Amino acid sequence: MVCELDGHLRPDDAASLEETSRFWVRRNEERWAEAVHDEGAQRIAVCDTDPLKLHYAWTLARAGLDAKADAFTCQLTLIRDSLKRKTLGIADLVACVVPSESVLRTHRAGDATRTRRNFEEHVLLAVPLKEWYEALNSVDPGRVVWEWPEEPLSGKRRERYDLDLFDAWMDRLPTV
């Protein structure tokens, strides 16, 4: 399992948008390298959260939580370059499970062991997150599943470093 990045990991507060974007893209390249290594050793790699992580900047802008789409645009350029260099790739399969708001609130109320910082913000990201992965699935059907699979899925997927796929996916997204 390739874990999500530590929530306390942050770029320098004085970093520019470009520096901040490069910081996050580098961290995600490290996660991708770990996933590729695990896949080579174990024939499969599972990542907690999409290694591209580009969805976060886009969903923030789409939900109106970041008034500018500048972070998304900056990261988009860097990530496209990472795909070209094969230091980041598109996950072969994405399980995008977005519980309803009522389920999220029930889980929160029933689990006092977690603080769930930014809970309200994350609730607002649910719809844009689904839009993000609907766009991917529309250009590469079957790459996204909407519930946890019972068994590993197989089947031919488009190349994980396919720039045409990436561009078609980005073109399919609603505007921010």
Summary of predicted features, one role per range:
Residues 36, 47-115:
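ATP-dependent NMP and nucleoside kinases share a basic, alpha-helical "lid"
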Residues 8, 53, 152:
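Residue-level detector of flexible, active-site-proximal loop/helix-junction positions
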Residues 1-44:
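Conserved substrate/cofactor phosphate-moiety recognition/catalytic segment
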Residues 21-30, 68-82, 119-131, 162-167:
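Well-ordered, non-membrane alpha-helical segments in soluble/globular domains
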Residues 109-176:
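NTP-dependent small-molecule kinase module
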Residues 16, 60-61, 158-161:
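Surface-exposed beta-strand edges and their flanking turn/coil or helix-capping segments
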Residues 32-39, 83-87, 129-137:
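Hydrophobic, Leu/Ile/Phe/Ala-enriched alpha-helical segments that form helix-helix packing faces
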Residues 1-4, 44-48, 94-97, 145-147:
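A structural signal for short, well-ordered beta-strand segments and their strand-loop junctions
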